Amino acid sequence: LNVFCAGSVAARAAAFKHPAMAYDISYCFQVMMQCINDPDFIQALRIFERKHCREFEEQEENKLIYTTIHNEYMQLIEMWIEGRMTQAIPGFNMETFLPELNEFIQSGAAERGDAKKVVDLLNSWADFPSFKEQMLDASKLVFFAIE
């Protein structure tokens, strides 16, 4: 993980905090974008895909193992994002943040800029059919030794 300069991050987080919310959602989205664009995060996802992609087959029926692998994938993503948020935002707590994030998304405010990019990516990762297609694509790359 790339480590943020703790002093400047803490000052920015405190300066932008909305009084009605525990966290400044706009700043949180910036931190999530930094995580999502982090080469180490991208590498971790690629390693996961290469490790598990051979389990996936192009067929309508889904094996039970697919659900297990998808859950592990989501845990990996959540671990990275929560780790980055904890580094960047003093006192960050995911259980406090998630209801605020949901409220922000439901308000329609997440339809702009980085917020939209982050929400779209999170939704695509959580969507099982998209995940399965991604794993099938990774399997083809591994099979043909393209990567």
Regions found by a protein language model. Give the residues of each.
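Alpha-helical bundle protein-protein interaction modules that mediate dimerization/oligomerization
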Residues: 81-84, 88-147
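Phospho-regulated, Ser/Thr/Pro-rich intrinsically disordered or coiled-coil terminal scaffolds
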Residues: 5-83, 88-96, 102-105
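Low-complexity, disordered terminal segments
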Residues: 1-2
